[in-house]
Amino acid sequence: VSLGLAIPAALVSRVPVQDPDAVRRGEYLFQASGGCACHGEPGNPQFSLAGGRPIKTPFGIIYGTNITPDKETGIGSWSDRNFLEAMREGMSPEGEPYYPVFPYTSFAEMTDGDVLDLKAYLFSLPPARKENKEPEFRFPYNTRASVSAWRMLHFDPKRYAPDSSKSEEWNRGAYLARAVAHCGECHTPRTFMGAPDQERYYAGSADGPEGELAPNITPHEKTGIGGWSSVDITWFLQTNLLPDGDSAQGLMAEVIDKGYKHLSESDLKAIAVYLKSLPPIENEVKKK
């Protein structure tokens, strides 16, 4: 009897106890990030965050990584510092730079508290043992030296700084859209070096994730969402229903279903207020 009791106790002792409030906050941030859809394996719920999803880019294919708390194949051995450095600085625990397909360029704007709450949530989930797959990039993009050079030119790891001239609602929407939901990562066209074109932020991209079109979400009347009201934007993020009754497909449908639809109406409205305030940019996104 004593042996039967000792074994579970030993197992439990190796599982870190997470603060339930941090887990709850982290789950909300996880949803605000779109449910980390890129880290799942399509059609396999058992590995919903264990990586393996191929993400096509103009430079080759990269695979979503295992972000479950498995200690050997996931992030289960990561310290708080490791997690912060990955999310905010794009560096692995081994000191290697991550490819910027991982949107640390946006997550860098998150607060330390929010990043660690997200970690608490991920570490509360069941671990899944699944090895990560190496990227399939062509030369020279398959070298870490090229990543380091890219970072020197295009990465500025600064936190979000509230704009005192704007409302609290606007700042909340800006923080969610820019940092947590990382909308600009998909909806901003890229330069030939794969960096976001800062002069056309949110203006849409023909080279979206998995070869999909990422529409213009600036308030341009003809090529963007200038004809949408804040209510239209909020409703879309809740239901995936466009103002004309159609719906988004592909990855956007996934991030709404796994993430955005679970957010509070006030947060979705804040995102809408922020998007409506952006400079309208004319850019009709078409297939190449």
Task: Tell me the role of every PLM-derived stretch.
Residues 54-85, 105-113, 200-243, 256-268:
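Electron-transfer interface patches adjacent to heme c in soluble/periplasmic c-type cytochromes
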Residues 1-9:
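N-terminal type II signal-anchor transmembrane helix
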Residues 130-145, 287:
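Extended, well-folded interaction surfaces typified by the phenylalanyl-tRNA synthetase beta subunit core
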Residues 38-44, 88-89, 123-124, 186-192, ...:
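Detector for the c-type heme attachment site
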Residues 81, 90, 95-106, 111-121:
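Membrane-embedded segments
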Residues 10-12, 23-27, 47-73, 101-105, ...:
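Sequence context of c-type cytochrome heme-c attachment sites
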Residues 9-31, 149-178:
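Electrostatic cytochrome c docking/interface patches
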Residues 26, 33-42, 83, 118, ...:
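The canonical Cys-X-X-Cys-His
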